[in-house]
């Protein structure tokens, strides 16, 4: 609820409102426990006994610690929904690595005198190129603090090696090998296979490089497709070579030769200079004698121990809003925001940032390959309205292509990772034709309509030239609109945009050369730019503000478990859980709602009762209250 609206309410109305939210929250809690109670019992039984996890860490300036970061699993840049995180932790299957958590912990560790060094172990690490680039940048920044950084490669793929090479010492598992071909695109084509099944695809497009449906029509990539993939591959390879060469202290020609050869045994990798040692942990490298006496602390335990922030947060000047748009763009209701990007779902966040006086600038994090043209245009309009009133900086993740780029262009500044896939300024449509399918399998299609486009609408028919002309005109109109809006946002003539467009995809580095983005960098760089545009001191920390969600009607809290979770997150939990926490804490009261919940949950954990809850609830409830180093 908008803070100004709260102030305008009379006292009785405010009391009634708080009682309503309280009751609604309890409905959500009760409904959630009833629905998930049996699941919780089974899950806890299957997890087995044992001690609750400990987050206490014992080290000091006199006896500094070695931090260990295990990089096994999926890198995720957006924190998962409350229900997803709860269920994954409940069943012990939460292998996701959250980049914001890693960034915060490494930043603090770099300035913490109690931390002597960092060891990372890289196994089955997966993620987009942009996420891996962001992770590597964090490690480079930690190394630049002057503290030793050791990396142990359990599995040696090219992008795992890319991350590991940020370390000053790289150790390779003796049973492993390095397989590093570098950027590789595998293009699979189904044209002939579909024709054998009696299926033909008619593609209508604006932009000769717009090749999304080419695989369903042809048996091999077109020259235009090969051209854009070759240039993008070379751009990504050049970045990979430059980054590894700088960290390993080698010339670019040597590193490029490594990737061309592609395959090394552990001993060959050591002899060629790709790694420094062969072994199972950091002790295989030249550690000082004092390292053996240093306590070994997991990075997640260090983060949970409440490591001190080195700089104060400026709380009285407002803050910067972070809005995340991740996934495909499609039409849908606001409740489908967890399943991609919808105009209604994102509009709530954009309008909140536009009207909330505490928000002085906005970082819009976009990671989207595109989607619906209509949905993209609706979001573009909302971003435009926001940018007309407050500075907006777009931070591009893995993708900001097609519709993902469309919704980016109203922002005052666009920042991409070198490995971001962007551009794809074009429009494409597909019409399946099943006439041969009808002849082959005896399946017929009949359509009853007064429309003159009957053959076009019938999957078993063939559209006329007039049909195709009409469809092409709609495609061309959308493309023309796309060009005009890019030209408006990037402040360049439409003809120049058209020359860069044509549906062609680019790496972030290519996009910078073409002036489709303003700078190369990650999310921290976007926050720095936002601070500049907001008139903040870039060397100080300011609160990062998050949209807390709209309130739910009472009956909405009684829906599916997922809906109950959303109800808890969007207001119900903030009111209902504190009194519940106080009650469960055997009457212990607290003036701080977050503190009350934390103390109660700590007792549960110490009793070994519910070890999955601290990370689940504290991350979600504390999130709107917390400030980070942006």
Predicted feature residues:
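Intrinsically disordered, low-complexity segments enriched in small/flexible residues
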Residues: 1-87, 91-94, 100-102, 184-266, ...
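Cleft-lining beta-strand/loop regions that shape enzyme active-site pockets
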Residues: 58-60, 65-190, 313-437, 476
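Short acidic-hydrophobic, aromatic-tinged amphipathic segments that line or gate anion-handling sites
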Residues: 171-172, 275-281, 415-416, 517-523
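Amphipathic alpha-helical substructures
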Residues: 251-272, 277, 491-521
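Generic long, charged, amphipathic alpha-helical segments
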Residues: 376-382, 389, 484-489, 496-503
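Conserved phosphate-handling catalytic cores of large alpha/beta enzymes
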Residues: 413, 432-446, 450, 459-460
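Short beta-alpha connecting loops at secondary-structure transitions
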Residues: 418-426, 455-472
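Alpha-helical coiled-coil heptad-repeat segments
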Residues: 463, 468-469, 473-490
């Amino acid at each position: 609820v908008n803070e100004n609206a709260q102030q305008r309410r009379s006292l009785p109305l405010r009391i009634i409102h708080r009682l309503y939210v309280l009751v609604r929250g309890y409905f959500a809690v009760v409904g959630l426990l009833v629905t998930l109670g049996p699941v919780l019992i089974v899950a806890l039984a299957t997890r087995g006994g044992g001690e609750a996890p400990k987050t206490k860490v014992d080290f000091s300036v006199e006896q500094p610690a070695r931090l260990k970061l295990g990089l096994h699993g999926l890198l995720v840049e957006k924190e998962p929904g409350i229900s997803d995180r709860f269920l994954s932790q409940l069943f012990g299957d939460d292998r996701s690595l959250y980049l914001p958590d890693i960034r915060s912990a490494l930043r603090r560790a770099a300035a913490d005198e109690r931390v002597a060094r960092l060891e990372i172990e890289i196994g089955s690490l997966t993620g987009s190129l942009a996420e891996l680039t962001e992770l590597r940048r964090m490690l480079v920044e930690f190394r630049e603090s002057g503290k030793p950084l050791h990396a142990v490669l359990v599995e040696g793929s090219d992008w795992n090696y890319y991350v590991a090479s940020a370390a000053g010492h790289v150790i390779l598992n003796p049973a492993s090998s390095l397989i590093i071909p570098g950027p590789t695109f595998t293009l699979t084509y189904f044209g002939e296979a579909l024709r054998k099944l009696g299926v033909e695809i008619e593609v209508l497009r604006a932009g000769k490089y717009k090749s999304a449906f080419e695989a369903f029509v042809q048996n091999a990539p077109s020259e235009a497709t090969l051209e854009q993939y070759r240039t993008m591959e070379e751009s990504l390879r050049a970045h990979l070579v430059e980054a590894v060469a700088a960290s390993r202290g080698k010339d670019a020609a040597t590193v490029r030769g490594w990737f061309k050869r592609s395959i090394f045994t552990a001993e060959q990798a050591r002899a060629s200079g790709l790694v420094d040692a062969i072994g199972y942990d950091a002790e295989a490298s030249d550690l000082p004698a004092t390292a053996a006496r240093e306590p070994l602390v997991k990075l997640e335990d260090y983060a949970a121990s409440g490591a001190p922030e080195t700089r104060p947060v400026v709380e009285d000047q407002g803050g910067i809003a972070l809005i995340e748009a991740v996934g495909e763009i499609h039409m849908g209701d606001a409740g489908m925001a967890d399943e991609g990007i919808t105009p209604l779902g994102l509009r709530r966040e954009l309008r909140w940032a536009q009207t909330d006086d505490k928000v002085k600038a906005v970082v819009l994090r976009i990671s989207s390959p595109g989607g619906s043209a209509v949905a993209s245009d609706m979001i573009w309009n909302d971003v435009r309205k926001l940018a007309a009133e407050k500075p907006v900086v777009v931070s591009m993740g893995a993708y900001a292509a097609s519709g993902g780029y469309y919704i980016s262009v109203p922002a005052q500044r666009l920042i991409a990772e070198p490995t971001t896939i962007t551009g794809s300024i074009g429009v494409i449509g597909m019409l399946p034709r099943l006439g041969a399918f009808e002849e082959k399998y005896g399946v017929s299609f009949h359509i009853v309509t007064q429309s003159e486009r009957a053959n076009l609408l019938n999957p078993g028919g063939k559209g006329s030239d007039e049909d195709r002309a009409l469809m092409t005109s709609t495609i061309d109109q959308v493309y023309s609109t796309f060009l005009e809006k890019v030209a408006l946002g990037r402040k360049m003539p439409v003809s120049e945009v058209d020359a860069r467009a044509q549906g062609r995809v680019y790496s972030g580095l290519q996009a910078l050369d073409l002036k489709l983005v303003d700078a190369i960098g990650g999310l921290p760089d976007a926050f720095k730019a936002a601070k500049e545009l907001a008139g903040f001191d870039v060397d100080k920390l300011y609160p990062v503000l998050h949209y807390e969600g709209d309130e739910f009607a009472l009956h909405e809290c009684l829906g599916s478990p997922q809906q109950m979770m959303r109800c808890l997150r969007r207001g119900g939990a903030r009111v209902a859980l504190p009194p519940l926490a106080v009650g469960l804490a055997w009457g212990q009261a607290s003036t701080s709602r977050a503190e009350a919940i934390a103390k109660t949950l700590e007792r549960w954990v110490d009793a070994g009762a519910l070890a999955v809850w601290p990370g689940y609830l504290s991350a979600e409830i504390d999130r709107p209250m917390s400030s980070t180093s942006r």
